[in-house]
Amino acid sequence: MAAAAEEGMSAAALVMSVPDSIGRSPESEGVGAGDEEKDAATKGTVAVGDSEEDGEDVFEVERILDMKCEGGKNLYKVRWKGYTSEDDTWEPEVHLEDCKEVLLEFRKKLAENKAKAVRKDIQRLSLNNDIFEADSDSDQQSDTKEDISPRKKKKKIKCKEETSPEDLRKKRTKMGKLKDKFKTELESTSEIIGFDVKTKKRIWEVKEELKDSKKPKKDEIKETKELKKANKRAEVRDLKIKIREDVKENRKTKKERYIESPLESESPNDSLILEDDSEDFISDNREENQNVRSVRDKTAQETVQEGIFEKHLDDLISIEEDAGTRVRRKKTKPRKFEEPKEIKKLESTNAFLERRAIPKKQRNQDKGISNLELNKLPSPVFAQTLKSSRLSGEEKSLKSPDLAEEEKEKKNEPKGKYQKRYDLDKEEKARKEPKVLKSFKEIRNAFDLFKKTTEEKNDVLENNSKREEISLDSKIMNDNKTKDKCSLKEKRNTRDETDTWAYIAAEGDQEVSDSVCQTDETSDGRQPVLSLGMDLQLEWMKLEDFQKHLDGEDEPFITTNRIPNNLLRDAVKNGDYIAVKVALNSNEEYNLDQEDSTGMTLVMLAAAGGQDDLLRLLITKGAKVNGRQKNGTTALIHAAEKNFLTTVAILLEAGAFVNVQQSNGETALMKACKRGNSDIVRLVIECGADCNILSKHQNSALYFAKQCNNVLVYELLKSHLETLSRVAEETIRDYFESRLALLEPVFPIACHRLCEGPDFSTDFNYMPPQNMPEGSGVLLFIFHANFLGKDVIARLCGPCSVQAVVLNDKFQLPVFLDSHFVYSFSPVAGPNKLFIRLTEAPFAKVKLLIGAYRVQLQ
């Protein structure tokens, strides 16, 4: 058999052995060569091509794509069978010694036409070679790897010697119980064995013919393909008929042999693809003796199981016909049971391992379940699952019968062996964890849920839920898992959030006062090192800490190094909050109002840079916000000019003056109008900014708003001025009860914040009318007003802060002796200078609206 298999090696599928240490081969799950060879020598037969047990991974070369010369050596680009172009590797010629035919074919093609791409000449083996490939592949690969691993070859030869005719007879007698749970007649098994030998001889003849024509022409290749297909169909048809005849004969002789041979059957696919080793036979015989009693109790169930088997067999054979050219391999493990595995493609191999892992867990759960419950479900489920599996890959359709075969063996085994096998499986799974694609996981879960009882489903759901906690990208497998997954995700999110804040709270004890800064403390207790990172990261602090930070009440830093004034100034200029914090919390005294050559203070530097944290810190430490440069610029003007809205808000809250003018007469409101920032404009005018102040060039804020073509800012200012005029006139009419008629204003209404100082002054031009009507004159009104957003409330009664009014160096007299809101006013034609002395009230919120009107008594 070994010689025939060797001669039948096809030029269409060559096996190449690649050591783990060379280059980049397609991914494998192999382990060290030395350890695996030692394991193979001591534990029994090891099938060639098993990527888990062999020291080397065995891959099939599909074709050679390209060749290049590098470092004086020829490298060949190899396409591996079952892999995509992404897994192509460059291999030296020495690695292709076992694939000389492929190499010669490539060289021949290269000589014929170098410009053309290498055509795919290597064809896969037909199903003729697949039926008993578990036998032939072992011999074929043993000869291929003769020089590399002699010990493995000896093991394989020993395995073949052990498979004696007596063993085959035992195995075939078990196959008879495939459908009816009883041992078949010796004649039936002999016929099956004889049929198998004839079938193998026919396959060997086909292989010999294929070997004689290893390099056929295109026409010969087509004829060979047609011949293979015809032989394949004929063999499958004959095999199906033969098995059905054996089933009928077994059914007739079942009752006669019942008392003499009550033995347990094995998997339904033994006659097709599975061969057991000697250890398997011993354990199975024990198993059969122990189950004699249970077999007698199950006679009533056999007719149902026979029908299930026939249906299952039809499905399997129909899948065999559609399978195409696929390679089936046998895998033996150093344990008392056999688990078949096909090595053809790495992804499909991993998927099969994962699908095998679930039945291993299930074995331990099946202890309390009757054989009737287990045997009624698998067969139809297998057929349905196998068909759906073929849609995602060709390999799956052949793996599923193996899986069915393996599970039927395990279900019929005594309960005493479940725990031992579960322990062995658990140990091996701990050593080798397969990588599985998500699509295979979905198929596996759907596959298993059909076979499990309600109690088992609950156990599997718990295990799957644990996996879903680890993998956030897992998909919902079925409706039963959805609720568990949602609840677990909610718990996990709540736990993560709680842990995050708990970690922050715990870390707060290690931080050096300010939650914005983190300190890195070494494990050996060395001096804490300041982490000069980004400030104001809210993930680092709780809400209470952030509020303390805003209020400047966070704990001080402790430092022993003195920071000089020039470095403090540079830190403010560069926005280094930590350095400023350390300096201001030290014992060193700093002049926070220090000025440079232009009069720029630290507050101005922070405002001009938009450093809100530094600005709050400096204000908290007592820095003045209304300092002026030599050109009259203030911190508020800097912030408005640089368009920093939050900085403007901080300064206004700290009491910054809004009507301060630069040397060119411009105010913060004018700067905001130039920038076109309506938010800053609204914020400033609601705080009492004077919209009618004129610059050095006699331009008002309204002029700058119009100049920047910002309609929103212009309308905002115009609306505010109209509101002030309307409120002033209404207040006058209400106060004088229509005894006084307003003719025209003498100058636009001015606004002065009492907190900005006790003195108010303004210049205006007055042009008296040519004809002054009798009973008319000019009065000065000083309203006390409050701004409530866009609303303005004014009064001419109550407490008054006006002490004196001076016009052109002449005191003006109040109209009412007990009230200083209304003064007689005598301007001259031309320029006039008005000065008003007020009560000093630096914290007053009241605004003064100052306006003069020409009035007529009625």
UniProtKB/Swiss-Prot annotation:
Compositionally biased residues, Basic and acidic residues:
159-169, 283-300, 335-357, 407-431
Please name one Pfam family that this protein belongs to: Chromo
Assigned keywords, A-Z: ANK repeat, Chromosome, Nucleus, Phosphoprotein, Repeat, Transcription, Transcription regulation
Q: Can the keyword Ligase be found in this entry's annotation?
A: no
Q: Where does the source fall among the domains of life?
A: Eukaryota
Functional description taken from the UniProt entry: Heterochromatin component that specifically recognizes and binds methylated 'Lys-9' of histone H3 (H3K9me) and promotes recruitment of proteins that mediate epigenetic repression. Mediates recruitment of the HUSH complex to H3K9me3 sites: the HUSH complex is recruited to genomic loci rich in H3K9me3 and is required to maintain transcriptional silencing by promoting recruitment of SETDB1, a histone methyltransferase that mediates further deposition of H3K9me3, as well as MORC2.
Q: Where is this region: Disordered?
A: 18-55, 129-175, 209-234, 250-300, 321-431
What protein name is recorded for this chain?
Answer: M-phase phosphoprotein 8
Q: Where is this region: Histone H3K9me3 binding?
A: 80-87
Partners and quaternary state?
Answer: Homodimer. Interacts (via chromo domain) with histone H3K9me3. Has the highest affinity for H3K9me3, and lesser affinity for H3K9me2 and H3K9me1. Component of the HUSH complex; at least composed of TASOR, PPHLN1 and MPHOSPH8. Interacts with DNMT3, EHMT1 and SETDB1. Interacts with MORC2; the interaction associateS MORC2 with the HUSH complex which recruits MORC2 to heterochromatic loci. Interacts with ZNF638; leading to recruitment of the HUSH complex to unintegrated retroviral DNA. Interacts with TASOR.
Gene3D superfamilies to which the protein is assigned, alphabetical: 2.40.50.40, Ankyrin repeat-containing domain
**What gene is this protein translated from?**
Mphosph8
Originating organism: Mus musculus
Q: Which residues carry this modification: Phosphoserine?
A: 51, 85, 136, 138, 149, 164, 188, 267, 271, 278, 318, 392, 400
ANK repeat residue numbers: 598-627, 631-660, 664-693, 697-726
Principal subcellular localisation of the protein = nucleus
Point out residues bearing the modification Phosphothreonine. 144, 385, 453
UniProt GO MF annotations: chromatin binding; histone H3K9me2/3 reader activity
